Design a protein with these regions (language model features):
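Buried hydrophobic positions in well-ordered alpha/beta secondary-structure cores of metabolic enzymes
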Residues: 10, 52, 59, 75, ...
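Flexible, small-/acidic-enriched active-site or ligand-binding loops
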Residues: 192-219
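A short, Trp-centered hydrophobic/proline-enriched beta-strand micro-motif
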Residues: 119-127, 171
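Amphipathic, small/basic residue-rich leader segments at the start of a protein or domain
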Residues: 1-90, 107-118, 122
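A short core secondary-structure module
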Residues: 140, 148-149, 153-199
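N-terminal glycine-rich flavin-associated loop
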Residues: 88-107, 133
């Protein structure tokens, strides 16, 4: 029953004008980029949200459907190539959103999660650094407490989608005097904050999916950790 409902909705609402391009895998994505993939993705995400098909496994009160893991897999099978359209939302839906859901305040959940689910806002994660990839504990980006705020200085790299993201999850070192796997704190921040500089990395295939991100005296409220 769930599969037939999903299939019926997708057949009636999917942007079929992109089906041929999307079926060509990465080459299709390069060609689709001429249409502004982020804006096309936002439109598809909003349509899914309006129909009750966005972020299926999330609770309904945060913009999801309350679906089971099996139903989520069925949806992904039925969505097929159109799932590529929402690539800009994959990190937000799969990583950032669930983190806010698990550790954020109720106010933060109700403010940010529905807008992520509806396609209005995009999130990225700011973990890797030039000296900290697989071992994130080697990171050097610092956050220092000043009153009710934290001031962040440092650099991240290989950040997918930072150049079009509205918000990001950031891990920074808040206590340099303890073993490296301790003294780390996670924040979320507005990517348009003063002191945030995003530099896209041009890839050999012509695309720019990854970025360097620099933080210079970026102020983050204590309520965003």
């Amino acid at each position: 029953e769930f599969r037939s409902l999903a299939r019926k909705w997708i057949n009636a609402n999917a942007p079929k004008e992109f089906e041929q391009e999307l079926s060509k895998s990465s080459l299709g994505r390069i060609r689709l980029a001429k249409h502004d993939m982020v804006e096309v993705g936002k439109a598809w995400q909003k349509k899914k949200s309006d129909g009750g098909w966005a972020c299926l496994h999330w609770p309904k009160e945060y913009g999801g459907r309350g679906a089971t893991p099996i139903e989520r897999v069925i949806w992904q099978q039925e969505e097929g190539v159109y799932g590529k359209l929402t690539q800009p939302f994959q990190i937000g839906e799969g990583m950032c959103g669930p983190t806010v859901m698990a550790w954020g305040s109720e106010e933060a959940k109700r403010r940010y999660l529905p807008k992520l689910a509806s396609g209005e806002e995009i999130w990225c994660q700011l973990f890797s650094e030039p000296s900290a990839g697989s071992d994130v504990a080697g990171l050097r980006t610092r956050a220092e407490k000043k009153g009710d705020n934290w001031v962040v200085n440092g650099q991240k790299i290989w950040t997918s989608g930072a150049h079009y993201s509205d918000y990001g999850l950031l891990i920074a070192r808040t206590d340099p005097n303890v073993p490296k796997h301790k003294g780390l704190t996670m924040f979320f921040l507005d990517m348009k904050s003063p002191g945030v500089e995003v530099r896209p990395i041009k890839q050999a295939n012509g695309m720019q999916e990854f970025n360097e991100v620099y933080f210079t005296d970026v102020v983050i409220p204590d309520s965003q950790r």
